[in-house]
């Protein structure tokens, strides 16, 4: 995923562990070709920095309404 495409609140799939996460920070400089992105895993209190190439955006219909989708967070999730 390109760093320019990453927006706060975007739902993404992490390639290394196939978990769904939410972008909670702007991409930060790491190397000229890679940026670090702060994410929060869904249904978890865990935050991590991931390299932007390890993230894939979920389809638009699985995004929050602010990003053009229809996803609604379940009541019993964190």
Regions found by a protein language model. Give the residues of each.
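Intrinsically disordered, low-complexity, charged/polar segments
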Residues: 43-78
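Mixed-charge, Lys/Arg-rich low-complexity intrinsically disordered regions
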Residues: 1-11, 75-77
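Intrinsic disorder/low-complexity segments
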Residues: 4, 16, 22, 35, ...
